[in-house]
Structures are given as C-alpha cells and as structure tokens.
Amino acid sequence: MKYLHTICLLFIFVARGNSRSCDFCHNIGKDCDGYEEECSSPEDVCGKVLLEISSASLSVRTVHKNCFSSSICKLGQFDVNIGHHSYIRGRINCCEKEPCEDQLFPGLPLSKPNGYYCPGAIGLFTKDSTEYEAICKGTQTKCINIVGHRYEPFPGDISYNLKGCVSSCPLLSLSNATFEQNRNYLEKVECKDAIRLASL
C-alpha cells in the first residue's frame, strides 16, 4: 500500500501545464512516448523528470515529460530520506528544444547515521499523515515539510504531504490558492534544522 501511495504521489508532484509546445507523457520506467501539448503561463519550458522511490533493495522509477515553470527547473534535483530506509529522489532537466537530456541517478550513498533525525511522513489524500522518526545520514542536516494539493474533476481535491531529511533546503515557492483543474499547488514548504538525537 505504501508503494501504491508513493507512485500516485509522484504523478501528482509532476503536474501538467496547459504557448509553448512540449512532449507530454508519464510512465513507469526510464522513458515514455506521448503527444505534444501546448503550455500556458507560468509553465514556459519543456522538461523531463525522473523520479524514484527506493526502499531497502527495491526501487520504482517513473518518467514524466511535461511543461514546467522555470522555478521548478532551478530545483535540478532532490533527495528526501523519508525514514524506514526509504528515499524519494528526483532529477529534473529543462530544455529549450526537445528532447531533453537525462540526469542519471547515482547509487544511493552508503552513508551512516549522523546523529540527527527529522519527522518522516508520506501521505496521499491527507495533509497530516502520521509521523515517524527518520534517521538522517551523511550530509542530511535539514528537515523538509511539503504540503500541497492538486484539483481534479474526479476525485476532486487531492491533498498530499511529504516530510523527511534533506542535505539542503530547496528553493520552492508557494502557489496561489485556486481550484483550476489539473494544476499542482504548494501550500506549505518548511525547511528547518534537523533535531539532534539524544545521547544514550
């Protein structure tokens, strides 16, 4: 069930834009074939995003080609340690001309716990999932908390939240509240210092 929620969440994060034309497709794996779609402001560039959920030795990757705003393009990549030996990672590449090149995933770093932790959570259809302790590793000294929603004709307003350890705070901007369909909106982006584990 956790993987089903995560895959659904990955598709939500990569929301479609609606006058530039870009390839538009989603798929499980490394590549996809789709169709050309006109973009609308503020989605003004074409992009390709690779997303991965890893848990222990198992991983699932998805690919998304779409219209994006330049602010999303600046993110470049992200790696979130959500706890329980699980990660959500993304590689974003935007381009002026198709096809956009890939940014490959390196192997997960063999990092050791660094003495810090963050609240960890991943939730779909909720903005307040049950938290657990995500043990930070390596250079992860920040806690990320992202809450947002995507409005669809059916089933309607899809809420989501994501919490975990990160190495640096992403430059993400909050979105204006709206009920326009097929759009992804960030309601909360918090990034704080990780919490030091109590000495035994």
UniProtKB/Swiss-Prot annotation:
<dbReference type="InterPro" id="IPR016054">
    <property type="entry name" value="LY6_UPA_recep-like"/>
</dbReference>
<dbReference type="GO" id="GO:0005576">
    <property type="term" value="C:extracellular region"/>
</dbReference>
<feature type="disulfide bond">
    <location>
        <begin position="22"/>
        <end position="46"/>
    </location>
</feature>
<feature type="disulfide bond">
    <location>
        <begin position="25"/>
        <end position="32"/>
    </location>
</feature>
<dbReference type="InterPro" id="IPR050918">
    <property type="entry name" value="CNF-like_PLA2_Inhibitor"/>
</dbReference>
<feature type="disulfide bond">
    <location>
        <begin position="73"/>
        <end position="94"/>
    </location>
</feature>
<feature type="disulfide bond">
    <location>
        <begin position="118"/>
        <end position="143"/>
    </location>
</feature>
<dbReference type="Pfam" id="PF00021">
    <property type="entry name" value="UPAR_LY6"/>
</dbReference>
<feature type="disulfide bond">
    <location>
        <begin position="136"/>
        <end position="165"/>
    </location>
</feature>
<feature type="disulfide bond">
    <location>
        <begin position="169"/>
        <end position="191"/>
    </location>
</feature>
<keyword id="KW-0732">Signal</keyword>
<dbReference type="InterPro" id="IPR045860">
    <property type="entry name" value="Snake_toxin-like_sf"/>
</dbReference>
<protein>
    <recommendedName>
        <fullName>Phospholipase A2 inhibitor LNF1</fullName>
    </recommendedName>
</protein>
<comment type="function">
    <text>Inhibits the enzymatic activity of phospholipase A2 (PA2).</text>
</comment>
<feature type="disulfide bond">
    <location>
        <begin position="95"/>
        <end position="100"/>
    </location>
</feature>
<keyword id="KW-0325">Glycoprotein</keyword>
<keyword id="KW-0964">Secreted</keyword>
<dbReference type="Pfam" id="PF02988">
    <property type="entry name" value="PLA2_inh"/>
</dbReference>
<comment type="subunit">
    <text>Occurs as a mixture of oligomers. Tetrameric arrangement appears to be the predominant quaternary structure.</text>
</comment>
<dbReference type="InterPro" id="IPR016338">
    <property type="entry name" value="PLipase_A2-inh_b-type"/>
</dbReference>
<feature type="glycosylation site" description="N-linked (GlcNAc...) asparagine">
    <location>
        <position position="176"/>
    </location>
</feature>
<keyword id="KW-1015">Disulfide bond</keyword>
<feature type="disulfide bond">
    <location>
        <begin position="39"/>
        <end position="67"/>
    </location>
</feature>
<keyword id="KW-0593">Phospholipase A2 inhibitor</keyword>
<dbReference type="InterPro" id="IPR004126">
    <property type="entry name" value="PLipase_A2_inh_N"/>
</dbReference>
<comment type="similarity">
    <text>Belongs to the CNF-like-inhibitor family.</text>
</comment>
<dbReference type="GO" id="GO:0019834">
    <property type="term" value="F:phospholipase A2 inhibitor activity"/>
</dbReference>
<feature type="signal peptide">
    <location>
        <begin position="1"/>
        <end position="19"/>
    </location>
</feature>
